[in-house]
């Protein structure tokens, strides 16, 4: 049995392309692999807290030294990290906002990138602790940020996500980018291509 963590980050509901596509991926996977367990987290509708001063103090001090206040400050982060580490694979639905990810998803990443939980630091430098896992990241973009587009230089979304998840040890990442979703006929073609990519990804995942 494979444990999958499915996360959406769009604040939109029915009109969200990233939600629609990530749901299609998970539904198709569930149909093909009914024995697998799928956990779901909706960051768009149920955002996690941003880090604050108490969180930082707790994250960079031994748990046995925590006061009740520091223990409470880090409690949600501990729960999120536990959930994250319990998964074998990840499906993320991520819209592009201002060339990058929604702040809700950034807040989540800040909560799970934790010294001695998901990344370690020693004399040799940083080492990701989340190894041997896979991720599919489904993005939705209003414009064309594909590799052949002049606007690709504005795509800070995919490079950031590759970097931050690679930093904690997840390097087996497949992106399914739905571009040009604000462009009429191009939207229809882009969604069709994304759906085809979803089927290919499921066959290979």
UniProtKB/Swiss-Prot annotation:
GO molecular function terms listed in the Swiss-Prot or TrEMBL record: electron transfer activity; FMN binding; oxidoreductase activity, acting on NAD(P)H as acceptor; oxidoreductase activity, acting on NAD(P)H, quinone or similar compound as acceptor
InterPro entries (alphabetical): Flavodoxin_fold, Flavoprotein-like_sf, FMN-dep_NADH:Q_OxRdtase_AzoR1, NADH:quinone_OxRdtase_FMN_depd
Keywords of the record: Flavoprotein, FMN, NAD, Oxidoreductase
Catalytic reactions of this protein: 2 a quinone + NADH + H(+) = 2 a 1,4-benzosemiquinone + NAD(+); N,N-dimethyl-1,4-phenylenediamine + anthranilate + 2 NAD(+) = 2-(4-dimethylaminophenyl)diazenylbenzoate + 2 NADH + 2 H(+)
Co-factor note (free text): Binds 1 FMN per subunit.
Names of required cofactors: FMN
Residue positions binding FMN: 10, 16-18, 96-99
Primary role: Quinone reductase that provides resistance to thiol-specific stress caused by electrophilic quinones.
Quaternary organization: Homodimer.
Protein name: FMN-dependent NADH:quinone oxidoreductase
UniProt gene name: azoR
